Each structure stands twice: as structure tokens, then as C-alpha cells.
């Protein structure tokens, strides 16, 4: 079992539950997120658990991979980066939206429910006033 964790507390809980490793995922990731940045979260989790830590969230190239290893991660997970791959069979409209997105083109919704989620800004999100 390798769960995704957004905090040190959850990483410790997953280790006690028998996880083989944890994926420490920062707020830069796409989809459901925690509140800690990847580069702050990873070394804290590394220091708190004895199992391998895999870094995730906002890692898109060799610099992010190298930084993750320098912070003690034993591996990295890249997600959004691969949405643009030819092999990825997502909707082409969404794929183009992700590829063309700039650094200010994402928005976090769901904070008021306790379930924050990073999304690409769209007309739909502006219409529902999230």
C-alpha cells in the first residue's frame, strides 16, 4: 500500500497502518490537495517516518526531481505533466487546456468544504462562483 498524504500526521498514521511507502503530495498538484507546499512537506515527512517517501505535486522536470531527491525523497510521482502525452487518452479539449495553461491559470476550489481541489480555470468554474 502506498497512500498519498498531504501532511506529516497522515504520513505517520499510514506508516502505523502498514504502508510500504507514502507519497507526500503538496498543494501544487492537480486535483485534491493539501495545504503544504511540496518542497516544505517532503523533508518534514522524510524526517517523521521510516518508510520511503515519494515526492509529488508541481514536479515537472529534472530540476524538480533533483530537488526532491535532495530533500530526502526516494522517488517522485509526476501526474499532470503526462496528461499531454500522446499515450494519454483524455479528452483532447481538456488536454489542450492543460497544455496551454500558464502559471496563473489554476484555481483552488472546495476549501470551504475541507476538500481543496486544484483546477484549471474555466468558464464553468466562474459561472458557479466557486
Predicted regions: what is each one?
Residues 1-53, 63, 67-71:
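Alpha/beta enzyme core
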Residues 40-54, 60-128:
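Conserved active-site-proximal phosphate/metal-binding subdomains
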Amino acid at each position: 500500500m502506498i497512500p498519498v498524504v498531504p501532511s506529516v500526521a497522515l504520513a505517520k498514521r499510514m506508516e502505523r497502518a502498514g504502508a510500504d511507502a507514502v507519497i507526500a503530495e503538496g498543494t501544487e498538484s492537480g486535483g485534491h490537495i493539501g495545504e503544504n507546499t511540496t518542497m516544505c512537506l517532503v523533508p518534514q515527512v522524510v524526517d517523521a517516518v521510516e518508510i520511503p517517501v515519494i515526492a509529488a505535486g508541481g514536479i515537472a522536470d529534472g530540476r524538480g526531481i533533483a530537488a526532491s531527491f535532495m530533500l530526502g525523497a526516494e522517488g517522485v510521482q509526476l501526474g499532470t505533466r503526462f496528461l499531454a502525452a500522446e499515450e494519454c487518452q483524455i479528452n483532447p479539449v481538456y488536454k489542450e487546456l492543460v497544455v496551454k495553461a500558464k502559471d496563473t491559470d489554476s484555481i483552488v476550489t472546495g476549501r470551504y468544504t475541507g476538500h481543496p481541489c486544484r483546477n484549471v480555470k474555466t468558464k464553468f468554474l466562474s459561472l458557479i462562483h466557486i
